[in-house]
Design a protein with these regions (language model features):
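GHKL-type ATPase core
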Residues: 1-6, 87-111, 124-161
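Bergerat-fold GHKL ATPase/HATPase_c domain
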Residues: 1-59, 70, 104, 109-118
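Short, small-residue-rich loop/turn micro-motifs
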Residues: 19, 95, 121
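Active-site phosphate-binding and catalytic loops of NTP-dependent enzymes
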Residues: 24-28, 45-47, 65-81, 124-134, ...
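Conserved ATP-binding N-box helix of the HATPase_c
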Residues: 49-80, 140-147
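Structural motif
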Residues: 83-85
């Protein structure tokens, strides 16, 4: 049974083995498309090189902020700042924060909801009924964390940080 050996993988092992399923392609891609030149204020058609997975990771973090805006009827997360450079992506919002306490549905759990959201697949607030969310699978931030060499998460729920 060597070639067809039955295996059970952890969530993280599966994400690493099949990244395309979670965050898209991990290889450099080349596409012809319209490009905006900020200095001239004009568009030109040219070749863009990028890694789709990097775009998806940025999108996952931005989507979390947008979900807070939707959840609060656009009273919170009204300002979403995104900073991207050659080695990092930073997303900051003025939202409500992820609770800095253990989840109520898991007695005995000592990790905060924030830590769980950033480190555990299939966790979050997107599993209730009548949810209008962009993120629905509970894998976004935790997948970004899996592929990050450094992941810093900060949350302030109004009581704790």
């Amino acid at each position: 049974m060597s070639e067809r050996e039955f295996k059970i993988l952890t969530d993280v092992e599966h994400v690493l083995l099949r990244p395309n399923m979670y965050i898209g392609g991990i290889n450099l891609t080349e596409n012809e498309q319209w490009i905006y030149d900020k200095e001239s204020g004009k568009f030109s058609y040219g070749t863009v090189k990028y890694v789709p997975a990097v775009i998806k990771c940025a999108s996952e973090l931005i989507d979390n902020s947008i979900d807070v805006a939707i959840d609060t009827n656009f009273e919170k997360a009204t300002r979403i700042q995104v900073r991207v450079d050659d080695k990092s992506i930073e997303v900051v919002d003025n939202g409500i924060g992820i609770p800095c306490e253990p989840p109520k549905n898991k007695p005995g759990e000592t990790r905060t909801c924030a830590e769980i959201a950033w480190t555990t697949l299939k966790s979050g607030t997107s599993f209730g009924e009548n949810r209008n969310k962009i993120g629905t699978n509970g894998v976004g931030s935790s997948c970004v964390n899996v592929f990050s060499s450094l992941f810093i998460g900060e949350s302030d729920d109004g009581t704790r940080r």
